[in-house]
Amino acid sequence: RSGERDYLLKLLREEKTDVLIDQTEGGVTGRWGIFRTRTQMEEAPVKLVAVQHSSQYSALRYYHLVHKRRGAASFSGKCRDFLFNALALPVKRLRARWLQKSLFRELAANYDRIVTLSRGGMEEFRLLAPGTPAEKLAAIPNPVPPIEAPPLPQEKEQRVLFVGRLDNSVKGVDRLLRIWARAGKSLPDWHLDIVGDGPDAAALKELAERLRLSNVSFEGFRNPAPYYRRASIFCMTSTFEGFGLVLPEAMQHGCVPMAFNSYAAVRDLVIPGETGILAPPFDEEEYARQLLRLMQDDPLRSAMAQAGPQHAALFSPANVVREWNSLLQH
């Protein structure tokens, strides 16, 4: 990679760069970086800032849920899946954990600042890289572009919304259908809109048929804004996310969010009981119970919907730029 090193050093010197922000999680310096060590960058001394976009702690914690093989039709295929899940998957998880801890230790050693997307992300980084100085870590969320005006209360309908990629391994849309089978059948006037496309679209439509869900529509890939405006409740059922931009997007539109309490940033995005609801990780029965309560309790839902836009404003581009400016100047 000498060509890459020479090019980057030349560019940094010519541009008189003060700060280099690495959005690749260790792609500039470290074991998998352009530079193996920080000393190789001495010709172009810059402040190095690494940005963590995902929740690696949650990715490791729920590794088995994301990578588990399922759905084989034949007996031999089911046997292969069983052997992989029982024998290979635990080994792969241990290797992934070792690699991630090695990467985080190198980030802590080679970078001046490490930016996570949430306060909880800072804590998780230190769990994987113990001894990381607290002053090296900062939490700056992703920005949420503002909307012109939130919908009026009379625009809201009895609709629950999902927006995202139809990928069960991470997004858990199959969980949502099972949850809806518990909650939605009790209130047939309510409707679930699923906006998005992905590799599991056909399987999800088959699951909806098996569960005999009549008040569900698969909308495909669409502009979600009109759906946010008319929906009253937003459901995210992901195994984990890096941030979860759809949650503050929903709050901007007075659409009350629900999610599993399964990753760090969600606890910054949703204040339980005030701006939305967090269910215990992957407890579908409790999620359905809370969803049913939210659909039935108009005053509770209205109070959360009114609190949402103000909380979502914390993630405005202006606030995020202000935090970045503060970090870069110190």
Language-model regions, residue ranges each:
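A short, active-site helix/loop in glycosyltransferases that binds the activated sugar's phosphate group
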Residues: 89-136
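Conserved donor-binding/catalytic core segment of Leloir-type glycosyltransferases
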Residues: 148, 152-171, 177-180
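A conserved mid-protein helix/loop that constitutes part of the nucleotide-sugar donor-binding site
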Residues: 167-182, 199-205, 285
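Nucleotide-activated donor-binding/catalytic signature segment of Leloir-type glycosyltransferases, i.e.
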Residues: 202-221
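Aromatic "clamp/platform" in nucleotide-sugar-dependent glycosyltransferases that forms part
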Residues: 239
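Short hydrophobic beta-strand element within catalytic cores of glycosyltransferases
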Residues: 256-260
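Conserved acidic donor-binding segment of nucleotide-sugar-dependent glycosyltransferases
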Residues: 261, 271-273, 277-284, 293-299, ...
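A short, well-ordered alpha-helix in the C-terminal region of glycosyltransferases
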Residues: 286, 293, 300-314, 323-326
